[in-house]
């Protein structure tokens, strides 16, 4: 009898301890456009620091994630706790609609902040760059300024991803127009610049020799170089920097876990993972990828073309149409 009572008591204690443990565990839902190799590494590192937090992350293109959020809003509840993509205008839209929880990370003072109007609604978690990607078999001297792509060596063989399909391509075109005016696009057209499809495709075409150069994204280019592609990556004095913000959704069910994730994403450990993938970290105490042609992330931000995100958002449709018409000779 006593043994049965003791066994029952032990079993009850086990059930209670498991229930307490389950209640102590936190969960978090992350929507992100980051590639699997990056988010997978971040996830594993975060779990080691916070084994009591479970992350359910959903990785897709930024457009698909925003469509998902819109559908969830219509249904009455956004399921994501955290959003991390590279489409900065989306974050300004969500902010203006009251969809973001203000949170200043605990280590914010250690970070490089590219947003002059920062208010805690979202924080840059990495700094993507776009530069001139060139095939070293055809372009023997690395370009040093944007005007170099108007040269005869680039005629009919310089590519730009379609800004209607690629958000980063639209950002790069809009910033170059802001810096140099529409004359820059006119000169691209005069030199028979080609409009490709996505950001990856124009780099593939440059690696194959179909193009001799293109405007390309850093991490895609450096990954190609790592795999043996005969490519170079160069910055002009005016650097195109595209932040990748992270934000907490207003009314997040798992606010504490979300805050811990944002804090971790901005630590030296997480930023080293980000830098190893070929983008710029938001910390100066993290070494850059050796193939990035710049000395520091802070220098890149100082040299970057300044962005008016509201104008960028409002002018998108007209800018893309005029750009496409000009390059296609419809002007």
What residues fall within each predicted segment?
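Short beta-strand->loop
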Residues: 101-109, 121-123, 150, 229-240, ...
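Conserved C-terminal helix/tail region of periplasmic/extracytoplasmic solute-binding proteins
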Residues: 306-331
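A bilobed periplasmic-binding-protein/Venus flytrap-type ligand-binding module shared by bacterial periplasmic
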Residues: 131-138, 174, 242-254, 273-274
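A ligand-binding cleft/hinge motif common to bilobed small-molecule-binding domains
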Residues: 89-93, 212-232
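Periplasmic-binding protein-like
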Residues: 128, 186-189, 195-196, 227-252, ...
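Extracytoplasmic ligand-binding site segments that recognize negatively charged/polar headgroups
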Residues: 33-34, 39-40, 60-66, 78-210
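Mature extracytoplasmic/periplasmic domains
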Residues: 240, 249-307
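Short, polar/charged alpha-helical segment
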Residues: 28-55, 132
């Amino acid at each position: 009898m006593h043994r049965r009572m003791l066994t029952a008591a032990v079993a009850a204690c086990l059930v209670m301890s498991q229930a307490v443990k389950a209640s102590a565990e936190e969960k978090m839902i992350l929507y992100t456009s980051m590639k699997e190799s990056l988010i997978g590494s971040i996830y594993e590192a975060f779990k080691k620091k916070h084994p009591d937090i479970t992350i359910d992350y959903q990785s897709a293109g930024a457009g698909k994630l925003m469509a998902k959020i819109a559908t969830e809003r219509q249904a009455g509840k956004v399921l994501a706790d955290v959003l991390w993509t590279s489409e900065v205008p989306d974050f300004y839209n969500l902010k203006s609609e009251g969809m973001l929880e203000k949170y200043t990370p605990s280590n914010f003072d250690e970070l490089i902040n590219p947003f002059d109007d920062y208010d805690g609604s979202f924080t840059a978690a990495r700094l993507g760059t776009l530069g001139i990607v060139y095939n070293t078999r055809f372009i023997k001297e690395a370009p040093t300024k944007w005007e170099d792509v108007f040269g005869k060596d680039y005629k009919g063989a310089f590519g730009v991803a379609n800004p209607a399909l690629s958000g980063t391509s639209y950002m790069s075109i809009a910033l170059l127009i802001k810096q140099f005016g529409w004359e820059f696009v006119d000169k691209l057209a005069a030199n028979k610049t080609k409009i490709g499809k996505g950001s990856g495709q124009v780099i593939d075409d440059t690696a194959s020799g179909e193009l001799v150069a293109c405007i390309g994204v850093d991490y895609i280019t450096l990954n190609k170089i790592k795999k043996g592609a005969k490519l170079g990556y160069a910055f002009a004095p005016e650097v195109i920097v595209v932040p990748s913000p992270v934000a907490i959704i207003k009314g997040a069910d798992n606010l504490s876990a979300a805050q811990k994730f944002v804090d971790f994403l901005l630590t030296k450990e997480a930023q080293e993972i980000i830098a190893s993938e070929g983008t710029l970290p938001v910390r100066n105490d993290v070494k850059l990828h050796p193939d990035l042609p710049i000395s520091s992330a802070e220098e890149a931000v100082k040299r970057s073309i300044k962005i008016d995100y509201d104008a960028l958002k409002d002018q998108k449709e007209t800018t893309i149409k005029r750009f496409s018409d000009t390059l296609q000779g419809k002007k």
